[in-house]
């Protein structure tokens, strides 16, 4: 419905990127939803699909604005840093690790990047644990 209403084709509403998270398994497909159909504000749908012996499988399903591969690995797969914007001054940073089947959240921090009152960038981001 949204695609038709906005006169968009699917390829105009998503972005794709290949990531190399496990050299033995081959590339992983990163799909990011774009506004107006699959994102609102800075955050959109983010999906990762990996190819395994039994075919393609979704290995991460979330909402955010950035996924960064890290150098650290779990079970042979690169760990991921996943960012989700909360406000103009704050974001959530999640660490994801591969459990052998899919990526699961392994850590979470609230990161304040700018002064809440003025919007000016902080000299150094302030991190705290996410509330439970």
How would you describe each model-predicted region?
Residues 47-61, 96-106:
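Surface-exposed loop/turn elements that mediate protein-protein interactions on large endomembrane-trafficking
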Residues 3-5, 70-132:
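Acidic, small-residue rich beta-repeat scaffolds with periodic aromatic anchors
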Residues 9-12, 46-48, 116-118:
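Extracellular/mature segments of secreted proteins
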Residues 20-34, 72-84:
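Acidic/hydrophobic-patterned starts of short beta strands in beta-sheet-rich repeat architectures
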Residues 39-44, 87-91:
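Short, solvent-exposed loop/turn segments at conserved positions within beta-propeller repeat blades
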Residues 15-19, 45-49, 69-70, 93-96:
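Hydrophobic/aromatic beta-strand elements that line small-molecule binding cavities or substrate pockets
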Residues 1-8, 54-66, 107-109:
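Blade-edge motifs of beta-propeller repeat domains
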Residues 7-18, 132:
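Signature of short aromatic-glycine-proline-rich micro-motifs recurring in repeat-based ectodomains
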């Amino acid at each position: 419905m949204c695609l038709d209403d906005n006169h968009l084709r699917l390829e105009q509403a998503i972005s794709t990127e290949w990531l190399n998270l496990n050299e033995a398994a081959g590339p992983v497909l990163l799909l990011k939803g774009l506004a107006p159909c699959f994102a609102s504000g800075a955050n959109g749908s983010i999906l990762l699909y990996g190819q395994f012996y039994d075919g393609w499988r979704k290995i991460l399903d979330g909402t955010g604005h950035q996924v960064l591969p890290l150098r650290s690995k779990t079970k042979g797969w690169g760990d991921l840093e996943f960012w989700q914007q909360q406000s103009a001054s704050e974001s959530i940073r999640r660490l994801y690790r591969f459990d052998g089947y899919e990526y699961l959240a392994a850590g979470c921090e609230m990161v304040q990047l700018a002064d809440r009152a003025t919007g000016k960038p902080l000299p150094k981001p302030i991190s705290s644990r996410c509330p439970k």
